[in-house]
């Protein structure tokens, strides 16, 4: 149930603000797609943690490029 909520929030981001704002993704796949895949694969707790860590790495001094879900 919590996993579905996390996925719903990530999809809402993809369909809402992400469409209006200029593309600034540093990673492939995007953080929202990464979080959706992580929660689908590992569940709400571990997948949510992986998504949170990924979002925290998304800043000008962080990495970039291809970063798949482990």
UniProtKB/Swiss-Prot annotation:
Coiled coil: none annotated. It is found in: Cell inner membrane. It comes from Rhizorhabdus wittichii (strain DSM 6014 / CCUG 31198 / JCM 15750 / NBRC 105917 / EY 4224 / RW1). The keyword Plastid does not apply. Could be involved in insertion of integral membrane proteins into the membrane. It is a peripheral membrane protein. Its main location: membrane. It comes from the Bacteria. This is Putative membrane protein insertion efficiency factor. Disulfide bonds: none annotated. Signal peptide: none annotated. InterPro entries: Membr_insert_effic_factor_YidD (IPR002696). Keywords: Cell inner membrane, Cell membrane, Membrane. Belongs to the UPF0161 family. GO terms for cellular component: plasma membrane.
